[in-house]
Every structure is written in structure tokens, then in C-alpha cells.
Curated annotation (Swiss-Prot):
The keyword Chaperone does not apply. Present with 19300 molecules/cell in log phase SD medium. Residues 192-214 are annotated as: Disordered. This is Heat shock protein 26. SUPFAM superfamilies: HSP20-like chaperones (SSF49764). The keyword Lipid metabolism does not apply. It comes from the Eukaryota. The modification N-acetylserine is found at S2. One of its GO terms (molecular function) is identical protein binding. The modification Phosphothreonine is found at T42, T163. The lineage of its organism: Eukaryota, Fungi, Dikarya, Ascomycota, Saccharomycotina. The gene is HSP26. It comes from Saccharomyces cerevisiae (strain ATCC 204508 / S288c). Keywords: Acetylation, Phosphoprotein, Stress response. GO terms for cellular component: cytoplasm; cytoplasmic stress granule; mitochondrion; nucleus.
Length: 214
């Protein structure tokens, strides 16, 4: 560009600097620069082939929400949120749910628990929810904690809230819990469905409108 004006010379200088910077990137001139690894933008799929959104990386912690198909089972659970957003830091223990003909089977992975006093299980009838909370002990002691180079095991307090389906209902008095090999198994019996309430829909007639015909 050949204009005898300082204004255009200024923009020419900027363009030249940008071109030089781009060439520097192409030649690997910024050797100290390494692009941050990011999750791929390609859609993820669940076990049924349905596309689901990938989790985002907030504050350096991977937010690992449970599959969208389980939204009806899990209530709002602070253990699923990453730390750094005002939520208390806790362990997000995995939960498996099996729907049998006569009962629900819940499996909560809580390794290292040495006493049943470290696990608390409650059934909240008003919300039809099972609340499992407790604490997973650390594998480290005072002597070894300063020598750790890599630690992938989780320890600390946990809490999971599982909402059960309203139908056919559950027999709360006969819920059983068993702990073995690091897995807490809850057996939740279902109530027998009523024969006359197969679809749970009852027709309600509207009355008291004198002008309506029979």
C-alpha cells in the first residue's frame, strides 16, 4: 500500500507484524508454547446409541455428571459438582441401579469402609428417596502422606440421593442392605401392583353444568 499518510502506514505496520507472527507459529518458533488439551467436540454416545453432551472442564476439574438417562433417578447431588464453585468437596461414589421384576437393586461402590457405622442409609417416604452417606477412609497415614507421588484413590465424605419411581411403590419396611468387597448392595422390594390400576389413569367426569346434555 502506497499512501503518503501516517494513518495508513500505521495499519501497514500492524499487518506486517501479524504476518510475521503467523509465520513464526508455522515454523515452530514458539517452542515454549504448548496448546492446552481439550475434550473433542465430537458428540458422545451412550449405550443405546443416543448422542449425549460431553462434560465441560471447569476450574481444572472434570465435571462428570451421570448419564442423561438417569436424570429421573438421581436427585440434585452436590457430590457431582466440581470443587471451586462454593460446593463442599466430597467424593462422587459410583452407583449402579438394576430394575428387577420384584425389586430394585442398588449397588454403591464405597471401598475401604471398615465399619457399618461409617455408612448411613435413610429412606425418605415423603420424597420416595434413598439417601446413602458416609465416609471413605484414606489409605494414607501420617507417616506415608508426605511420600506420595501419585494418588488416584478417593477418600472423604460422600452422599448420594436416589429417587425411586412412584409406581408401583416400594416396601420400605423390607429394604435390605449388605456390604461386601467394597460394594454396598441395597435390595428394595416393589409393592405388588393393583389389578384394577394397570394404567393408573382414572377418568373424572365433569358435572354441574346445567346446559350440557346427558
Amino acid at each position: 500500500m502506497s499512501f503518503n499518510s501516517p494513518f495508513f502506514d500505521f495499519f501497514d505496520n500492524i499487518n506486517n507484524e501479524v504476518d510475521a507472527f503467523n509465520r513464526l507459529l508455522g515454523e515452530g518458533g514458539l517452542r515454549g508454547y504448548a496448546p492446552r488439551r481439550q475434550l473433542a467436540n465430537t458428540p458422545a454416545k451412550d449405550s443405546t446409541g443416543k448422542e449425549v453432551a460431553r462434560p465441560n472442564n471447569y476450574a481444572g476439574a472434570l465435571y462428570d455428571p451421570r448419564d442423561e438417562t438417569l436424570d429421573d433417578w438421581f436427585d440434585n447431588d452436590l457430590s457431582l459438582f466440581p470443587s471451586g464453585f462454593g460446593f463442599p468437596r466430597s467424593v462422587a461414589v459410583p452407583v449402579d441401579i438394576l430394575d428387577h421384576d420384584n425389586n430394585y437393586e442398588l449397588k454403591v461402590v464405597v471401598p475401604g469402609v471398615k465399619s457399618k457405622k461409617d455408612i448411613d442409609i435413610e429412606y425418605h417416604q415423603n420424597k420416595n428417596q434413598i439417601l446413602v452417606s458416609g465416609e471413605i477412609p484414606s489409605t494414607l497415614n501420617e507417616e506415608s502422606k508426605d511420600k506420595v507421588k501419585v494418588k488416584e484413590s478417593s477418600s472423604g465424605k460422600f452422599k448420594r440421593v436416589i429417587t425411586l419411581p412412584d409406581y408401583p411403590g416400594v416396601d420400605a419396611d423390607n429394604i435390605k442392605a449388605d456390604y461386601a468387597n467394597g460394594v454396598l448392595t441395597l435390595t428394595v422390594p416393589k409393592l405388588k401392583p393393583q389389578k384394577d390400576g394397570k394404567n393408573h389413569v382414572k377418568k373424572i367426569e365433569v358435572s354441574s353444568q346445567e346446559s350440557w346434555g346427558n
